[in-house]
Swiss-Prot record:
Pfam families: DUF4177. It comes from the Bacteria. InterPro entries: YjzH-like. This is Uncharacterized protein YjzH. The gene is yjzH.
Amino acid sequence: MKEYEFVRVELSTMRRRPKEDYQQIIHDYAKRGWRFVQIFAPSIDGYGAAAYFEIIFERDAEKA
């Protein structure tokens, strides 16, 4: 079984640049055993651009 983690990264209003270093987020999660799956932009604002994106990670779930 897998478990998933979703990390939301906001984009700046004017330039649409990430407010956080998404590459560093991916490296940090990889060090903790998570595998990068996808970057997904689920929300579109009034101008047709993404308002934020989510970075999706997975890893094997710990057995109880």
